[in-house]
């Protein structure tokens, strides 16, 4: 039986709207849940997430005016499971590398801030300087770096369950790989389930 752990980005990835031919986030989730239901009933697949990720997903749906019946179905097909905060074994090397990467990013962010300050002192529209600083600082410090407790919990849950982690988050995938956890992006996830279901349909 294949197990999947769902990250927030597995649902909110904007490419899914085009894939499913819909416009709203809640319509993506509706299609997702239909696929999950079929995969669980016909293939025995199971789907999990953590309480923090489920809270994030519900928050996105509530803000998108999602029908309440769809939100209520989330817990039917996606099982919510807490991670063990004392039993999970993560190699010390993973944390050593992570801390080193955080330090490198912070140093890079400092250089970005210094350069932006110099440019601002040379003149120009302050609002434009701030926008550029935010964009470059975010690029320097956050892109491809795990920066969320919810993401870390998703990776640990996948490790504990021996599950495949579904996410489009580059930093989360990097960590998952170091933990020996398989990681696939949301589009591959959808196409994988569809392919399995098509095989069952063709071969009974």
Curated annotation (Swiss-Prot):
Enzyme Commission identifier(s): 3.1.26.5
UniProt cross-references to CDD domains, sorted A to Z: PIN_VapC-like
Catalysed reactions listed for this entry: Endonucleolytic cleavage of RNA, removing 5'-extranucleotides from tRNA precursor
Catalytic class of the enzyme: hydrolase
A GO molecular-function annotation: ribonuclease P activity
Swiss-Prot/TrEMBL GO biological process terms: tRNA 5'-leader removal
Membrane-crossing segments per the record: none
Alphabetically ordered keywords of this record: Endonuclease, Hydrolase, Nuclease, tRNA processing
The keyword Chaperone appears for this protein: no
Membership in a protein family: Belongs to the HARP family.
NCBIfam families associated with the record: PRK04358.1-6, RNA_lig_partner
Function: RNA-free RNase P that catalyzes the removal of the 5'-leader sequence from pre-tRNA to produce the mature 5'-terminus.
The name this protein goes by in its record: RNA-free ribonuclease P
